[in-house]
């Protein structure tokens, strides 16, 4: 048996270090309807184990009855149930450890039907066989631009609504095919 050998320098034991990595399974923009659920998911890694923080519009997201955060050793998920318009915003996730940080984001838009146009309807021109109306757009477009207005008319003494147009993008419309002396009701 020989004599033991000694190291020439002291050795320091330390954990393996790897900067965080982040791969999101989402696009940069996500549109959902009011009442629908949505989730933002991805995978991450790093040593030491990274800290995960979710944000909405730069404010830390907290779990509640509709918002859930799940983190496993390799995956992340932020889920929102029964979305409301106020859930719209820029969501981001930060994965960080002592070696650095990574950030991913997604712009979420929660859309709904627009509110009705602002009244009253203005009768710009009135003729014996037609009139021209105008109105103001809705105060709330539902989260996306109004693509068309549906205008209908009816004789004031009947229950049957007749379409005037369903393709108007303007806030003005000519209502044709009227009978002189009759009263009409219009809805937009």
What positions do the PLM features span?
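Beta-strand-rich modules
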Residues: 1, 174-188
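Flexible inter-domain hinge/linker segments at boundaries of tandem extracellular adhesion modules
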Residues: 2-27, 56-63, 70-75, 96-99, ...
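Solvent-exposed loop segments of extracellular immunoglobulin-like
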Residues: 48-55, 131, 145-149
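A short beta-strand segment in extracellular, disulfide-stabilized domains
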Residues: 36-44, 120, 131-136
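Exposed aromatic-hydrophobic patches
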Residues: 41, 77-81, 136, 172-177
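Extracellular Ig-like/FN3 beta-sandwich strand-entry sites
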Residues: 37, 47-49, 86-90, 101, ...
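Surface-exposed loops/turns
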Residues: 34, 46, 72, 85, ...
């Amino acid at each position: 048996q020989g004599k033991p050998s000694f190291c020439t320098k002291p050795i320091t034991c330390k954990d393996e270090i790897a900067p965080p990595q982040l791969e999101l399974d989402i696009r940069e923009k996500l549109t959902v309807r009011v009442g629908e659920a949505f989730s933002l998911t991805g995978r991450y890694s790093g040593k030491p184990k990274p800290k995960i923080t979710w944000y909405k519009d730069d404010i830390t997201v907290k779990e509640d009855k509709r918002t859930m955060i799940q983190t496993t050793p390799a995956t992340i998920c932020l889920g929102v149930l029964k979305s409301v318009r106020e859930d719209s915003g820029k969501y981001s996730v930060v994965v960080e450890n002592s070696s650095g940080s990574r950030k991913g984001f997604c712009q979420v838009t929660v859309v709904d039907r627009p509110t009705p146009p602002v009244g009253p309807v203005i009768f710009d021109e009135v003729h014996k066989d037609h009139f021209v109306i105008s109105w103001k757009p809705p105060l709330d477009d539902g989260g996306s631009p109004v693509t068309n207005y549906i205008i209908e008319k009816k004789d004031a003494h009947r229950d049957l609504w007749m379409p005037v147009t369903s393709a108007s993008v303007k806030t003005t419309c000519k209502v044709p095919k009227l009978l002189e002396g009759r009263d009409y009701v219009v809805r937009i």
